[in-house]
């Protein structure tokens, strides 16, 4: 009996794209394809998708950007070839190719086919090139790569950085499928803390629901101290009052370790809780070490309410060292009221 291997059409076409690239022994091969919805770029290294901001090859995170323009595609990939081997991958979103080079241009190709080819290339490439190839794959339109990315995240034969990048990209899909996959990765005790932590952080999206917060809270008692820090980070991104109240309760819980309480306080301050929640927290801190840490956390807010409380701590805390810490952070403020307060102290 002769066995016949039947490949899915997308796999066959991806191989076809690979053969076209392999025909170029030396030089640059480039091609273009449609970008997934919600993705845009500046035509160079900066890309935005939803709340995620990426500056290739090293910056991956969430927040706002000051991009002057953001083009909704297409995705442009350039592959460097030398002696019949691929030596580089580069990807841009938006913009257009230079007409001055002698690159082999394959034109517009199928986005799913390009994604399959590039996903395979990411697993085979070195550190820098794998980052570009994986990004180029997930930028593609008309293909769901969440299952593939999850397999990559679980594959211990791949480099740790690539596995963590795969988890990050799962989080950018922002749908029920990706959320379920992140839950599965975060709760899988067979995975190392780096992968689980990446999944927890990826759940801390701008649109995270109260159900997401509740799920993270249920995970919290069963994870390591390192992963608890990741839970605090993720929960802090929620605007729900329940998230703020929970972080506050952890800070006030004297059954928790000092490190855990300090981390919960830090992320309460870094997150979206109103400053008034931080101000009220002070009265629950009996430990001097926590009150010292509190002055730093409060100093990061840089609003009127936070400065008022810092001044109050500097004047009235029972511990001299805590008062000095508060004074130090007041001295770092550029608020004119801080300068006035320091000047008044000196001239008394």
Regions found by a protein language model. Give the residues of each.
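Core register positions within helices of long alpha-helical scaffolds
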Residues: 136, 169, 202, 234-237, ...
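Amphipathic alpha-helical scaffolding segments comprising HEAT/armadillo-like alpha-solenoid repeats
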Residues: 111-123, 142-154, 175-187, 197, ...
